[in-house]
Regions:
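Residues at the C-termini of beta-strands that transition into short coil/loop
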Residues: 46, 77, 150
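C-terminal end-helix/capping segment
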Residues: 124-145
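A structural signal for short, well-ordered beta-strand segments and their strand-loop junctions
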Residues: 7-8, 43-45, 115-117, 148
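Active-site neighborhoods of divalent-metal-dependent phosphate/nucleic-acid chemistry enzymes
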Residues: 73-130, 153
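Short, well-structured N-terminal submotif of metal-dependent ribonuclease cores
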Residues: 1-44, 53-65, 71, 89-95, ...
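Short, C-terminally biased terminal segments at protein or domain edges
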Residues: 141-155
Length: 155
């Protein structure tokens, strides 16, 4: 049986080091344990790496880089950017949050099974999920299921 392909946006590795929200921190850590145990085929994109490299806290940045080191990194292709722009044009994601649109687009273009996020403002939202599915269907793309880590781990 093939492993599920998962895409992690930047919130997931970030929560591994966020002790202010212990339940989410525990779930993010557990997800990374599952990844290390190779229960999933785990991906991030070059957009996630860029966000990590732009972290202001150097110690945190170094920890994040180390954490995602073994994950496969997807290229943010022109097709990904085009689909992200479509989400923005249709007011699904605000322009100032283009990286959020890129995360969703990469998961769609690369036919990922699950996009895992704690971004409740722009990604893990019924309105976003429904609108992304509609646009992807219209344009012939498969939609990744957008979920939180708790949905794929044993809590």
């Amino acid at each position: 049986m093939r492993k599920l392909k998962i895409y992690l946006d930047t919130t997931i590795p970030s929560y591994v080091f966020n002790s202010h929200v212990p339940d989410k921190q525990m779930a993010a850590k557990k997800l990374f344990e599952h990844i290390v145990q190779e229960r999933f085929e785990a991906y991030i994109s070059a957009a996630v790496m860029r966000e990590i490299l732009n972290a202001k806290n150097k110690a945190l940045r170094d920890e994040l880089i180390l954490l995602v080191k073994g994950l496969k990194v997807l290229e943010v292709s022109s097709e990904c950017i085009g689909l992200a722009e479509e989400y923005i044009k249709r007011d699904i994601i605000p322009r100032e949050n283009i990286d959020d649109a890129i995360h969703i687009a990469c998961a769609s273009i690369y036919e990922i099974d699950f996009l895992i996020s704690y971004n409740f403002e722009h990604i893990v939202k019924i309105k976003t999920i429904d609108n992304v599915q509609a646009v992807n269907l219209l344009l012939g793309y498969r939609s990744a299921r957008i979920i939180v880590p708790e949905e794929v781990i044993d809590v």
